[in-house]
Amino acid sequence: MDELAFGEAALEQTLAEMCELDTAVLNDIEDMLQLINNQDSDFPGLFDAPYAGGETGDTGPSSPGANSPESFSSASLASSLEAFLGGPKVTPAPLSPPPSAPAALKMYPSVSPFSPGPGIKEEPVPLTILQPAAPQPSPGTLLPPSFPAPPVQLSPAPVLGYSSLPSGFSGTLPGNTQQPPSSLPLAPAPGVLPTPALHTQVQSLASQQPLPASAAPRTNTVTSQVQQVPVVLQPHFIKADSLLLTAVKTDAGATVKTAGISTLAPGTAVQAGPLQTLVSGGTILATVPLVVDTDKLPIHRLAAGSKALGSAQSRGEKRTAHNAIEKRYRSSINDKIVELKDLVVGTEAKLNKSAVLRKAIDYIRFLQHSNQKLKQENLTLRSAHKSKSLKDLVSACGSGGGTDVSMEGMKPEVVETLTPPPSDAGSPSQSSPLSFGSRASSSGGSDSEPDSPAFEDSQVKAQRLPSHSRGMLDRSRLALCVLAFLCLTCNPLASLFGWGILTPSDATGTHRSSGRSMLEAESRDGSNWTQWLLPPLVWLANGLLVLACLALLFVYGEPVTRPHSGPAVHFWRHRKQADLDLARGDFPQAAQQLWLALQALGRPLPTSNLDLACSLLWNLIRHLLQRLWVGRWLAGQAGGLLRDRGLRKDARASARDAAVVYHKLHQLHAMGKYTGGHLAASNLALSALNLAECAGDAISMATLAEIYVAAALRVKTSLPRALHFLTRFFLSSARQACLAQSGSVPLAMQWLCHPVGHRFFVDGDWAVHGAPPESLYSVAGNPVDPLAQVTRLFREHLLERALNCIAQPSPGAADGDREFSDALGYLQLLNSCSDAAGAPACSFSVSSSMAATTGPDPVAKWWASLTAVVIHWLRRDEEAAERLYPLVEHIPQVLQDTERPLPRAALYSFKAARALLDHRKVESSPASLAICEKASGYLRDSLASTPTGSSIDKAMQLLLCDLLLVARTSLWQRQQSPASVQVAHGTSNGPQASALELRGFQHDLSSLRRLAQSFRPAMRRVFLHEATARLMAGASPARTHQLLDRSLRRRAGSSGKGGTTAELEPRPTWREHTEALLLASCYLPPAFLSAPGQRMSMLAEAARTVEKLGDHRLLLDCQQMLLRLGGGTTVTSS
């Protein structure tokens, strides 16, 4: 390290001597700068040339300003500085070259930048002030001098090559500086520092240690605090003989280059302020305040306050940036999920993110599975073709269609993959694991997809089918039928042949009118041989003409679609798309796809009334011909009489496919999903039926039976009542079709073979609706199958019949147990129908029949089990009831979610009756009564919510209300002493019921009275339960006897006078009669009994009735009471 040329003592002495001069000079400079800043117009020549320089550059001697004539001499300035400092200047080699990036510095055009002249020597000393930045003024604004309150503190900093600074401090723009970012506000340095403060700072430099020799050359660093603004200052020491004061306005748009600053990293952001000048002892010190970004300074030079403020700002900025990134990230995810939803389920669907991702995963798995099947099929077809020789392939192509693979022989899943459907934005997938309400497909924005990859290598090129394979239109068919009918009725050939034979004779007679009559007679005798030969020839010609017409209609007029041909590919494509649309619920689009599928098969639907009439007439004629087996045999020869067996098989398969599509369109029409009148629907039904019969063994018997039943539905719906006998014919054909092949009827149609179901279908008053109403007693089946809706109506009919057997049995029932046995029979049939019918469990596929898409109906099964349990309780068959407890305890979820209170009333009534009818409990627990009260509350809510409900609702409400009353009565009777004791002692009534039990009984009785106002059969139970309530309350027995007498006498006079009155008032049943006898014999006082032995006779009659009803436990009780009354004798039934 080189020795310094001066010491600290010399610097302090020099500064002390010049203190007074410095103070005076600084005051003058401040006044002059104030005058210049406030009145620029008073010095017009000061900002003119040669001071006005428009360019910026280095502040060294090479600057353009050095050539100005009014510049100071650099040599004189250097000599003065050396004389002043007292030693030569040592300039070591720089450690590293400074960066050359310019800093933003803009000069006013009227002010020339300060440039040292030849006699002026410039020494840049960078000073770094490390404080947080303050707001930055706009460029080009002239800043007035500011005088901060606190003095500027200059930290000790080593100065290389100088003993001290003469006065003031100055700075210039360092090289390679940049404007700080807009997010980091900077404040300008003060324009002019106060003289005392500046003088104090300069004096404090004398006590600092010099820099070591290894420091950067010509570089000094001074740390200060000026209004919390980071400033980099580089001083210029100027010595002149005369005082020259200049002030230069700077701007951020200009750039100033310097040699470099060792304490600043390259790229430091700076800000230029107004140029400041300081004159002291003939030396001019020009300074330019700069603003330096604190982030570019060394960490160890940052002040504590700067660190705290900088870290707070950094955290806020990082948090803001993090939030912005997170927002963009979430927005990107949401956009992609929305796009994925549009691809998977379409734009109309509303799903959450989880459901969209789940469906996308399911569809991806489906695509992977499909690709796997396609690869396997491709390998199979490749191996099949490789096994054939070239000769076989050529011969197969020459024979026509030899390489076609039968569509019927393939597996269903292979057929599905061979002709994939078109994919649109909302289509679901073919067989998603979520079954068919949640299927999805990928969106391609196009109407169709390319053919399946399974045919890329093995599919035979579609051959151009012959014209006869395309089929005939229905108008042409009807014209041929009319021609054949005319040939059989009008016999035009006979007239034609007769005219041809008689023409020669007539001609000869005309030319020989004057001839002899004997010759004419001879000529006529010669033509007699044609008279007996002409009729057979004419009829033979007519027969041949009719056979030709039939052959054209059935054999050569039927369109035959060969597998893998162009029409077949289009057909399967539209059919699979129709399956997807049906699964998605887009029924109009599905009908459109089915229409296109029929058009691809060469069977377009009629588009005008004339076409519709022709098509309907042709289908009627064809069905009549097929009933005669002529049309069916001819249809079996479709494609040509001399064709091979493979073509006939393809013809049957084509007829099967067309029949299935016609059948599905008919179902859509029946459910209101396809437009058209009754004639169009009848035409669809007949077309499906005729083609299904022509398909032969190519169609399954279940599908054929379903088509027959659909035709019977159409007869019942569209035809007048006089033609409803055709319904029986079609149902019989369906049953024969099933029994002929397998000997069994599909589960979904077994109820049609039952007498009750057959009678309901033929004679029932029902109708198929497009939007069936919601029901509590059965779930809806396939929404596009009318037979499923009829089956649902039949299940509800069975439940209603079972309830009516209890509520209003037939008046001619001689057997008392018949009402219960009939009800249990209906319920058993309902259980079997519920096991085989319900919501679809497979698919909505066009080819799927009802037999393959049925499932259990848990709702109907639950109601049937509940009703059966109540009937077993009324019969006092507790063992049979206990077997059904598990089925009733688990209520279906559909009934739990409903808002109607009737299912909850049924469930709590079952629980309450189960607790109260338990004969092992003599006393009632509060919990049992609480459940009973809850059931009563739900029942009252049900009566209030459905004042005009259906008959099945009222029958179920009557059953539940009667069950609660019977359960309360049974509990009260168990709490009584034995009836024999009461009778022996002649008591009139037993102990009364508690207030809680009596209040609950009155509430249920009020519900029964309210129900009886709209449901007449409930009136019988009102009389009996009202008499029971009076007995429980201990009321006057007179009114009780009248109420019991109504139930006793109505049974005796079954055909009494006033038949109209008897019909209006419902007749009591055997069960009600028995209950009235027991109540009268056990609880009425002896005064109300007409004869002494009447009580015993009443008990004997009750015992006989109970025996008919099958209540063995009550029969045993009656016999015990008779034993006590008769003194050891028993009374049996006679």
Curated annotation (Swiss-Prot):
Activity regulation remarks: Activation by cleavage is down-regulated upon activation of SIRT3-dependent PRKAA1/AMPK-alpha signaling cascade which leads to inhibition of ATP-consuming lipogenesis to restore cellular energy balance.
Gene Ontology cellular component list: cytoplasm; endoplasmic reticulum membrane; ER to Golgi transport vesicle membrane; Golgi membrane; membrane; nucleoplasm; nucleus; protein-containing complex
Positions of the record's site feature: Cleavage: 451-452, 480-481, 519-520
InterPro entries recorded: bHLH_dom (IPR011598), HLH_DNA-bd_sf (IPR036638)
Biased composition (Polar residues): 59-69, 170-179
Spans annotated as Disordered: 46-73, 130-149, 170-195, 415-468
Listed GO MF terms: chromatin binding; DNA binding; DNA-binding transcription activator activity, RNA polymerase II-specific; DNA-binding transcription factor activity; DNA-binding transcription factor activity, RNA polymerase II-specific; nuclear receptor activity; protein dimerization activity; protein kinase binding
Organism: Mus musculus (Mouse)
Keyword field contains Lipid metabolism: yes
Annotated domain remarks: The 9aaTAD motif is a transactivation domain present in a large number of yeast and animal transcription factors.
The entry's keywords: Activator, Cholesterol metabolism, Cytoplasmic vesicle, DNA-binding, Endoplasmic reticulum, Golgi apparatus, Lipid metabolism, Membrane, Nucleus, Phosphoprotein, Steroid metabolism, Sterol metabolism, Transcription, Transcription regulation, Transmembrane, Transmembrane helix, Ubl conjugation
Biased composition (Low complexity): 424-453
Family designation: Belongs to the SREBP family.
Entry PTM: Phosphorylated by AMPK, leading to suppress protein processing and nuclear translocation, and repress target gene expression. Phosphorylation at Ser-389 by SIK1 represses activity possibly by inhibiting DNA-binding.
Name under which the protein is recorded: Sterol regulatory element-binding protein 1
Residue numbers bearing the Phosphoserine modification: 96, 115, 331-332, 389, 395, 448, 1047
CDD domains the record matches: bHLHzip_SREBP1 (cd18921)
Record's note on what induces expression: Up-regulated by endocannabinoid anandamide/AEA.
Gene name linked to the record: Srebf1
